[in-house]
Amino acid sequence: MAFGDIRGTLQVAANSITNPTNPAGSVAVQVGDLVFVAVGEQTALTATGATSSFVTTYAATNAGLDAGTVTGRAFWGRVTSAGTLTQISVAATASGDNVSAVAVVFEGPFTSSPLDANPALVEDITSSFSAPASGTLAQADELIVTWAVNGVAGVWTATSPNVKRVELATQTVLTTKIGSWVVAATTTVTPAWTGTNPTDSVLGTNSFKKDLTTFNNKPQMFAVL
């Protein structure tokens, strides 16, 4: 595996959101990995934070966005101890609202403060759907993460170089998805998707910095001829 590769996913969909809402799975994690969580909720934006084993602190990318009939918010955390991650708890207000929450674990090493690009969330209801532009990146080696919540059960397709990593619908109400790819230049990027036009949507873009010091100091294997 290499920097930015997918270690695994956790997910949950329900017709009624609970407090907490718990994306579940089984993913082996290492120190320096990144966990990214996207929460899609019907009508109300109530997700306030995330917690789990092996991650000391999760942070919200921003305050989230209420697009009308669907809302979305994302959280991220850097893995601080190794183990098998089986659940993430997302604090939210219990109600009859539908919810779809998904998480992806990305292989590191990421810097201790990895978040770089964090533009404001946008809405787009006409395919192709453009997430916000990242802006010029702080360094060449970064992971681009894009996510979306769309008010329709239809499948969306990631537009290259974006690669869809997870997508989960709750009934026909909404679908939450995460895509990603690794870049090797500081040039701004604009992630995109195509698919069924939704009633409304929330789209986000973030980038996370590779720990170049840790990576470059790893022992290298050379063949003896």
List where the protein language model places each region:
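Primarily extracytoplasmic/secreted proteins
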Residues: 1-225
